[in-house]
Amino acid sequence: RNVDQKKIFQFDDCTPNIKPLLSELRKKSQSIMIKASPMIDLSKGLLDLGPVAEIHIISVRNECKEIVFILNNESYTPPTLYCVNLDSLHPPLQGNLTEEKSLSIEYCMPKNIILDPNTSILKAGLFKTIGHHYGLSKIAINTHFFTSEEKLKEFPGRQFEVIGPLNKKNIKKLLPAGKANVITKNYPLSAGELKSRWGLTDGGNYFILGFRNQENEAQCWLTKKID
């Protein structure tokens, strides 16, 4: 935060501004660690800092808390991204954006399980990397839910068992108590707006996942979270 207690996240807005100091710091140190705001855009951070060896994206209980850039006197292209979610059983994931761009992934409708990666992985943008690592398909290019036939023994995020598509014709039958938890991604309504539209209250064991599929159709699916 600045002197007015406003949140800042660009290096240019910080005191001291690290950018004009980097040249001298690189002369005096083999390795430099820079802790940045979790709100920073990683691409902009890389442009500002020059050669970066590693980026550590650190979440605690699925809330991104720290972005740490590791610089040294060698040139790394691209840097390795390390994604961790502390105070959880989530395994770490690492990758880099060059490999991410080179990978391919299948897009398809939900299978038996829908998977939601943790915040660190979403911040890193390692979408095809996690799909490739765990053998997953993705719902759509801009919908960051994944899907598989079976539950994974370990996964850095949440897993949901699919019950089926949900709409205004079957919602009262499937949710007679009118209670559900709602998550929306790449969907025209927020979670709160969707709950209001269907007259739902928070709670219960069911999760409604709202998203757009690869054909850009807005859909809702009823699921149960797997513990």
Please tell me what each predicted stretch does.
Residues 1-227:
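SAM-dependent transferase fold signal centered on methyltransferase-like domains
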